[in-house]
UniProtKB/Swiss-Prot annotation:
Enzyme class: transferase
Example of a GO MF term: palmitoyltransferase activity
Record membrane topology: Multi-pass membrane protein
Protein source organism: Mus musculus (Mouse)
The keyword Magnesium is annotated on this UniProt entry: no
Protein's job: Palmitoyltransferase that catalyzes the addition of palmitate onto various protein substrates. Palmitoylates sex steroid hormone receptors, including ESR1, PGR and AR, thereby regulating their targeting to the plasma membrane. This affects rapid intracellular signaling by sex hormones via ERK and AKT kinases and the generation of cAMP, but does not affect that mediated by their nuclear receptor. Palmitoylates FYN, regulates its localization in hair follicles and plays a key role in epidermal homeostasis and hair follicle differentiation.
Family, similarity comment: Belongs to the DHHC palmitoyltransferase family.
Active site, renumbered: 120 (s-palmitoyl cysteine intermediate)
S-S pairs: none
Location of the DHHC domain: 90-140
Spans through the membrane: 17-37, 45-65, 134-154, 186-206
Matches recorded under InterPro entries: Palmitoyltrfase_DHHC, PFA4/ZDH16/20/ERF2-like
Protein name, as recorded: Palmitoyltransferase ZDHHC21
Length: 265
């Protein structure tokens, strides 16, 4: 199933996403320029570490772009409701359209989204049934890339041997300390924020509960898993092959699951 393009016109979301792209570009340029390539040239680190760094960076960027542009599960104006599932649908009191239960109307986007988790300004898009898996990959690779960059920043000053060849004519070399301090500040800030977000997302999937459902307290026991964790993750990622859960380049094939909780509606 191909991914439908979904573009949200929201200046606030553009600014938030632009900030994320800036942090990504800053680290993808500064860390290799100051740390990776100089230490590789002097034999302090193997080249595979540079390949891994760029690999994680590419996966992170692909997940960001696809999570931002993929239709999260917007409902059509005249959906075809299977006769056997009519009791699982309800009328939205904001847009007056029929929708599956567990859908939610996003006031910022102006339409209902299937199994909507929340609207995320950092990707300028809703997180719903069709792009939740990409959002999880974005959280994972952002955290991995941040840890990788912070680790090399620490090793650059406290573990690696001092560099013998330094071109002081380069701007990044003359102002290395200030540049690396800014990179460390952004990295620590990003790591703290993304760790909390990633944790809540994982708990939500394990308990089969969206963020909106948690906030509205519509579930009696949101902390008790109602399905095996392998099943809930497979439903989100659209495959039971765990290795594919980490690949942002593929297309998601949704598993046939109902849009409701057994005891939540």
């Amino acid at each position: 199933m191909g991914l439908r393009i979904h573009f949200v016109v929201d200046p606030h979301g553009w600014c938030c996403m632009g900030l994320i792209v800036f942090v990504w570009l800053y680290n993808i340029v500064i860390i290799p320029k100051i740390v990776l390539f100089p230490h590789y040239e002097e034999g302090h680190i193997p080249g595979i570490l540079i390949i891994i760094f760029y690999g994680i960076s590419i996966f992170c960027l692909v997940a960001l772009v696809r999570a931002s542009l993929t239709d999260p599960g917007r409902l059509p104006e005249n959906p075809k409701i299977p006769h056997a599932e009519r009791e699982l649908w309800e009328l939205c009191n904001k847009c007056n359209l029929m929708r599956p239960k567990r859908s939610h109307h996003c006031s910022r986007c102006g339409h209902c989204v299937r199994r909507m988790d929340h609207h995320c300004p950092w990707i300028n898009n809703c997180v719903g049934e069709d792009n939740h898996w990409l959002f999880l990959q974005l959280c994972f690779y952002t955290e991995l890339l941040t840890c990788y960059a912070l680790m090399f920043s620490f090793c650059h000053y406290y573990y690696f041997l001092p560099l013998k060849k330094r071109n002081l004519d380069l701007f990044v070399v003359r102002h290395e300390l200030a540049i690396m301090r800014l990179a460390a500040f952004m990295g620590i800030t990003m790591l703290v924020g993304i760790t909390g977000l990633f944790y809540t997302q994982l708990i939500g999937i394990i308990t089969d509960t969206t963020s909106i459902e948690k906030m509205s307290n519509c579930c009696e026991e949101i902390s008790r898993p109602r399905k095996p964790w392998q099943q809930t993750f497979s439903e989100v990622f659209g495959t039971r092959w765990k290795i594919l859960w980490f690949i942002p380049f593929r297309q998601r094939q949704p598993l046939r699951v109902p849009y409701h909780f057994a005891n939540h509606v």
